[in-house]
Amino acid sequence: MEPAKCNWDGMDRLPAYERYARILMTQRILIIDDEDDIRQVAAMSLETVAGWEVVLASSGKQGIERASSEQPDAILLDVMMPEMDGPTTLLKLKANGNTAHIPVLLLTAKVQGPDQRKFAEMGVAATLFKPFDPLTLARQISAALGWKEGG
């Protein structure tokens, strides 16, 4: 059964608790990472902490295919992957009319200063660092989806 999709029209006029409840109830997150352990930990974190549906991809190519077919609400993308790295995957996602609107959050162990600015210019919603805290991960994705604490 398909999860209910949220009508985002007027979300900014709703009280914060209602926006958050709608976000929690409707989200499907695509995790693109070549490391199985990271995919599994991130998936378990998002399923447990936020109750979100998770779709997994082990490469940039597979991630682009899944993003187009699954239409996730957000994408968590590893920077360092073989064959097609995170930045290349990001550019292809943003160039595709079916996936350009999806917020992308980068997951990395190494991004510093200039790289973070470069990724922001490429349209990244946020950069998260490994190892990550499950609650922080859920909060960052929530923020990328339009929910802000206290607002």
Question: Where does each model-flagged region fall?
Answer:
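Receiver (REC) domain active-site loop signature in two-component systems and cognate sites
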Residues: 81
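C-terminal output helix
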Residues: 132-141
